[in-house]
């Protein structure tokens, strides 16, 4: 397919002239182009694009003949015919230069290896020097309307209603003329034997073109009627012509024929192009399709283009370029797929939004191989004379095109480069290899074929292009090997390619390049195989002589299929040989099939393919046998897809001793037509048992009709198929891109599209060409097609087949999107239909989607992306959204349930929404979905605050605007703040988009807040009852719950601990703490004096303070702190290390059983910690501070000093003030540095003097204000740098002399002034 590239080039004419060119016409091979002006004809060369010769008519001759109007080439490029205004036909001979043989010659440096291997070597790389010589003019005595060149004759239509047949040698054979009134016309050829049509009086042919494959002329009359004239014999005579009309067409303007597809394109004054074909049975003109702009894509210009001025088919007949009287260019594929139009988007508008004037074209023509489009701009009457002179030299434009060969890879080819897709080369697979289903990969390599948007550009060397331009790419299955073959051709072009030309194309088989070529030296058609590892030389090639010219070539596994010029098909087998020093291959003819009965002309065959696809009888074969055998031949005959499959009606004879590849091949059945209007065909040479539907299907591109797939139907669970059901079905579907390749297993279509970049940087009076046209690039595109196929199967009541196909593709990453697309497309079509649908498809689609676990997500995502007006229709088919919401809650899919909550909020009254939101909120709290909880809090605060208790009114679906689906959300109080794609990822946001009323609504706001607080309190109580302290802490931190104040209120209710053993067990389990372990030797008796009293080891009994601590009664008055305590604590680290060592050797025992006989009473809670060995206290350092809140105040004095550093300051707030002082006095001074400064605020000043001086650096300076001045002399000098300067004024001056001098640089000067003067020095 064709794509614009870059900016158009401007060709400057070296000869200055006051005349503007107005017509351009290429030669038969398109190497030369004739440019015509009023009295001048010029010949241009295609590559390089240079002027060769120009002929200027004299004034006297111009007055006699009139101005030039039209030009036509002789098929052998030896003559040119020019039609003049006064009815003369001027014939020119084109003669090669005598002295100067070449107009331009390349100059090579000395020593460069440039040798003339074959005749014509330099002619191919240099522009020849030509001259024009006028022959005797022919006077037809009437104005000439059009010219048409034939093989040996020139057909001329005049305004007097005659057709003149002139021989190119006008002297020898004279001329013949036919009056149009004598030609019989009818609607078909079967009834055209009647009398002549009398209504052709005064009518003449405005435009005509000869179609070689139809053997006739497509004509447009001056009254707008169109027709087709065909001769009954080889000679043009009155009794040997007959014609057919096209009914109801009276506005024809021009015509262009497509020889390869046998199509006739007629331009109309309405701006449309009608494409006709000739019915093979009746001979009538049958409308195939239309090429026209649609109001959907071009609402501003679709009916303002004016009449069609010119139509030009590309050299390969695959696309048609159309231009109108009002200007503009538009490109369509052969069967109507629209590709490019310069009347819209960046072509028609500047970057500031102003509209450009469209480019008006007077003539255009395709260049060699379609890489260029030569365009002549028409003169504009509104342009001033000065600007007209400037534009005089810039009237010839050359548009650059790159095109695709429609193969298994996305590969684009330009004039001198290749555009190859980027990806992982390790995932590609050689098409020629026949892998079994067990070893074949399950994918074609998604990352390889998708790659990314960048192209890998392979620049072809200029030395290769000098003799081999233009380049052609055929059957490029592997993008890596395309690059390799181009490098090989560049390196060895002088050795091989100067002796042969490629005629049938290239293909890869394993490591061999298969070439169908013509040998110049032997004058023989050959089939050559070059090994990849050796030079591209005949010495390393396997050569097979052929008996006819090869037109097309293709490879299927170990077979090569050739289509020849005699309309025959040959099958060859290829076998690798290892008998020589280098690898080689042998080629053997297997079968030859004659198609001359079915193919009227060999040029009509577009493609030939071997495939394993069969019709109904072929489905009964086993999958491996069918996938690895060449069962059918597919021919694209002028858009008709014809299949020849092997005849298995008789027994298959095979000798037992013969190898499998020498078995007798079965003959082929008569051909059958599978489809019409086919542009491209894709089949797979691989097999995959898990995806047989996609791998054994046949994929077709049909232009305007979209795509078609010939899908196999398999019985479920290997059951016997029904006799009344077909084994295959043809399913059509539309896509938004032009397909270039099909990824079978990945259910994707890859393509390309033109993207434009505006360039408005130049500000001048004359708008430059770069500003008139945007810069064109080619971007890769892809589209999912699976939902189209599933829908078509459901329409045809093939739900079982659709389910099998969908289940085989359920592992694809975008399969949820496939289901969503299917629901969305069906919903849009049915809900917006103005007529009632007798058998709606949406309920069937909904039932189909329920077979997959993604049903709930699919429905809600589709609803969120659809207009609100269609929701009632959707949920009438899929079910009540309240039921779907409850299903989501039961399935614990809270994110999807939140999306359904948005649906309910818009379809139900606020009370229902609040009820379901409460359910979702409580469930989210239980599961710890804190993001969802925060959104639900905002949702509950906003919902129902300013709305009435009536459901929203559903707008009608009769009249809808493009923005009607979004107006609703702008008026609601809640909407999404993220796209629906983020919901699939598990996150969404609810945002308040309408400001809430103030003033009177404060009561409702407080009620909503109280309602939410009650739910939060209820959840906190539930967590506390279940001793889920970790979840309670996360709950408080994530949702901003005031835990401290709530615990103070609940300390006599739910915060009261009744079963301490169970609470401790839950605590260890919740925080994943191990239970305390002690050596077995340290326990002598579990009970003492009615209480649980463990006997410590001898090492612990050495500490007198520890013994007194164990035997003391638990009361609120702690023992006095002694110096022994300090010594006991210093030895604790060594004791713990010894215990750890003993535990690792002596076998630890858990304390769970040891704790079980404890008496569960609140006043004895402090006893629990007394029985823990001091070595376990470091574990308790990681206990969250909020745990201590539930411990009785009498517990603190008995806690080992090493425990206190982990106590959070907020704990002290909830402890009775009377215990503060007594607790801290008993704490060892070494723990104080870890106490947060805020604790000191609640400590009486008298306790600070007993605190060790090392604690003070960690106390915030502001706390010193509340400390008695008498404490300051004991503060360590090192703490003063951290004291804020505002503290010093309140500190007693007597302290200052003891302050170290090093802290003064940190004290603000204003502080020092208030300090005793004696310290300033």
Swiss-Prot record:
Under the heading SUPFAM superfamilies, the entry gives: WD40 repeat-like
* Observed phenotype of the null mutant: ric1-null mutant larvae show micrognathia, small head, shortened trunk, and short, kinked pectoral fins. Craniofacial cartilage elements and newly formed ossification centers are present but they are malformed and smaller than in wild-type controls. Chondrocytes of mutant fishes retain procollagen II intracellularly in large inclusions.
Sorted alphabetically, the keyword list is: Cytoplasm, Guanine-nucleotide releasing factor, Membrane, Phosphoprotein, Repeat, WD repeat
Q: Biological process (GO) annotations?
A: intracellular protein transport; retrograde transport, endosome to Golgi
Q: Name one GO cellular component term.
A: Golgi membrane
Gene3D superfamilies in the cross-refs: YVTN repeat-like/Quinoprotein amine dehydrogenase
Provide the primary localization.
cytoplasm
Keyword Cytoplasm, does the record have it?
A: yes
Q: Name one GO molecular function term.
A: guanyl-nucleotide exchange factor activity
Q: Partners and quaternary state?
A: Forms a complex with rgp1; the interaction enhances rab6a GTPase activity.
Q: What role does it play?
A: The RIC1-RGP1 complex acts as a guanine nucleotide exchange factor (GEF), which activates RAB6A by exchanging bound GDP for free GTP, and may be thereby required for efficient fusion of endosome-derived vesicles with the Golgi compartment. The RIC1-RGP1 complex participates in the recycling of mannose-6-phosphate receptors. It is a regulator of procollagen transport and secretion, and is required for correct cartilage morphogenesis and development of the craniofacial skeleton.
User: What is the official name of this protein in its record?
Assistant: Guanine nucleotide exchange factor subunit RIC1
Give the organism the record lists.
Danio rerio
Q: What is the lineage of its organism?
A: Eukaryota, Metazoa, Chordata, Craniata, Vertebrata
